[in-house]
């Protein structure tokens, strides 16, 4: 019901409930009842694909378009000839001047008609921590899966250190120097903490011998504060320790670019503080980081720039404090009525 009416406003579910009730009441029995249920299903599919904000969202969108056109016309009348209206994507001034490490152009990904990512163009600069934020379902994890090679793009290019990696398999991305973590840690359950980290050194693109990989794994485990759990199995670790094991495994690949996908989810405030300090130390080692996270105090503390996605589209990028004050970003998180 909230899908049909819209979930961004309290009145949306009520609109959806009335529409569905009336439709089912009209088709009350026999074949008509089956037809009614089929029509409800078809309507919901159409709404999900073409009206993700629901009926109220569509009406609100029309109102915003009319208001924006009126505002733009008023500004045009008051402005000198030659004045141009700014682009809808916010590109704010930043002090980062390092050369680009990762460049994506027109990156898009669709799943059977559902557009998970649409024409995203951005760059990750060498040595920075770039925050990637947005509401649930905005395309953040899809972006991570694309630039780590786990998904192949529908359109667009992925260039890393000047080399076009578009369409290559995930192990080629790893060999190029891109590593990632997962929202839910995925260690090998039958291997110890030390063995899990050493495995990455042997087969994650470095090609080290078992002895060398084990020696280096010990240092990464110490970096993550897990040296006292080196011979424990993953099932014997708590969530905090499993998250840090995930970081140690990613670091064992010695990446140039590290993609962190919600490493703070499920952690306590004190554990989040430890994780923030660790991410800072990882950057201090010279690793560039893309930081996908919902914990905004961590995003504000760590990132040099942030990029905001919503419904698969890039809607803002720039300095964290400035971007979070943008009306489009507020609308993405809180709904248009609160923007």
Model-inferred region functions:
Residues 4-8, 51, 222, 334-335:
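Residues at helix-coil transition
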Residues 10-11, 15, 38, 55, ...:
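Hydrophobic side chains within well-formed alpha-helices
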Residues 22, 37-43, 63-65, 220, ...:
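Short alpha-helical linear motifs
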Residues 28, 32, 51-52, 203:
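Short helix-capping/hinge motifs at transmembrane helix termini and TM-loop junctions
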Residues 51-61:
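Juxtamembrane/interfacial segments flanking transmembrane helices
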Residues 60-108, 337-339:
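ABC-family P-loop ATPase nucleotide-binding domain
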Residues 96-103, 108-339:
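Glycine-rich phosphate-binding loops of nucleotide-dependent enzymes
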């Amino acid at each position: 019901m909230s899908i049909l009416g819209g979930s961004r406003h309290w009145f949306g579910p009520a609109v959806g409930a009335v529409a569905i009730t009336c439709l089912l009441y009209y088709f009350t029995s026999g074949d008509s009842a089956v037809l009614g249920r089929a029509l409800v299903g078809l309507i919901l599919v159409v709404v999900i694909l073409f009206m993700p904000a629901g009926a109220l969202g569509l009406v609100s969108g029309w109102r915003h378009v009319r208001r924006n056109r009126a505002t733009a016309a008023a500004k045009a009348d008051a402005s000198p000839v030659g004045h141009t209206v700014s682009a809808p994507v916010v590109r704010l001034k930043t002090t980062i001047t390092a050369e680009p490490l990762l460049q994506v152009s027109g990156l898009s990904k669709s799943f059977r008609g559902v557009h998970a990512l649409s024409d995203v163009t951005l760059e990750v600069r060498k040595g920075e921590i770039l925050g990637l934020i947005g509401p649930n379902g905005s395309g953040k994890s899809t972006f991570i899966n694309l630039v780590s090679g786990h998904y192949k793009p529908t359109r667009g290019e992925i260039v890393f250190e000047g080399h076009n990696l578009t369409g290559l398999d995930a192990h080629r991305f790893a060999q190029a120097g891109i590593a990632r973590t997962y929202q839910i840690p995925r260690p090998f359950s039958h291997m110890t903490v030390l063995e899990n980290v050493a495995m990455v050194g042997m087969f994650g693109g470095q090609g080290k011998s078992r002895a060398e990989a084990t020696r280096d794994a010990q240092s990464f485990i110490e970096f993550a504060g897990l040296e006292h759990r080196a011979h424990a199995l993953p099932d014997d670790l708590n969530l905090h320790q499993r998250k840090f094991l995930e970081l140690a495994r990613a670091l064992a690949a010695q990446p140039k670019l590290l993609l962190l996908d919600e490493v703070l989810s499920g952690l306590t405030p004190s554990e989040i503080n430890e994780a923030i300090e660790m991410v800072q130390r990882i950057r201090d080692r010279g690793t560039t980081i893309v930081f996908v996270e919902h914990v905004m105090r961590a995003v504000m503390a760590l990132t040099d720039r942030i990029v905001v996605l919503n419904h698969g589209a890039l809607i803002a990028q720039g300095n964290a404090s400035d971007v979070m004050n943008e009306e489009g970003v507020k609308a993405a998180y809180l709904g248009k009525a609160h923007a």
